[in-house]
UniProtKB/Swiss-Prot annotation:
The keyword Transport does not apply. Keywords: Methylation, Ribonucleoprotein, Ribosomal protein, RNA-binding, rRNA-binding. Forms part of the ribosomal stalk which helps the ribosome interact with GTP-bound translation factors. One of its GO terms (molecular function) is structural constituent of ribosome. This is Large ribosomal subunit protein uL11. The keyword Iron does not apply. SUPFAM superfamilies: Ribosomal L11/L12e N-terminal domain, Ribosomal protein L11, C-terminal domain. It comes from Bacteroides thetaiotaomicron (strain ATCC 29148 / DSM 2079 / JCM 5827 / CCUG 10774 / NCTC 10582 / VPI-5482 / E50). InterPro entries: Ribosomal_uL11, Ribosomal_uL11_bac-typ, Ribosomal_uL11_C, Ribosomal_uL11_C_sf, Ribosomal_uL11_CS, Ribosomal_uL11_N, Ribosomal_uL11_N_sf. It holds the Pfam family Ribosomal_L11_N. One of its GO terms (biological process) is translation. NCBIfam families: L11_bact (TIGR01632). One or more lysine residues are methylated. GO terms for cellular component: cytosolic large ribosomal subunit.
């Protein structure tokens, strides 16, 4: 018989750096989940992604056991890394903080494709480019048309 799902918790944690302090401790402790067990498992699975912010979806069950799925880093974080800037623009319509090429956008879109709700790389590229524009990061040239 399948376990009864009691709920979901969504967090963003740095890879390899989960510890019982906030936000992890209070979020898991209030649901009765073993915090140290989660931290050990998460840190073991994210050693290769140390320092990167990773979204994690934790499914916890009525018997206090849990499973979790680690997603790819958010698009905004990836854009900041590729553009080599610390933050987006406070006025994205007026002040641009960086400029990316469509090839860089394609790389991010292909990396994030598994987590996005789109079917083609072109659609994913448009989503990533929209996020970049809203952060004050310009995209060079026109959208490449594949023939």
């Amino acid at each position: 018989m399948a376990k009864e799902v009691a709920g979901l918790i969504k967090l963003q944690i740095k890879g390899g750096a989960a510890n019982p302090s906030p936000p992890v401790g209070p979020a898991l402790g209030s649901k009765g989940i073993n915090i140290m067990e989660f931290c050990k498992q998460f840190n073991a699975r994210t050693q290769d992604k140390a320092g990167k912010i990773l979204p994690v979806i934790i499914t916890y069950y009525a018997d206090k056991s849990f499973d979790f799925v680690i997603k790819t880093p958010p698009v905004a974080i990836q854009l900041l890394e590729v553009a080599k800037v610390k933050s987006g623009s406070a006025e994205p319509n007026r002040k641009k903080v960086a400029e990316l090429t469509w090839e860089q956008i394609r790389t991010i879109a292909q990396d994030k494709m598994v987590d996005l709700n789109c079917f083609t790389v072109d659609a994913a590229m448009r989503m990533v480019a929209g996020t970049a524009r809203s952060m004050g990061i310009a995209v060079k040239g026109e959208f490449p048309v594949n023939n």
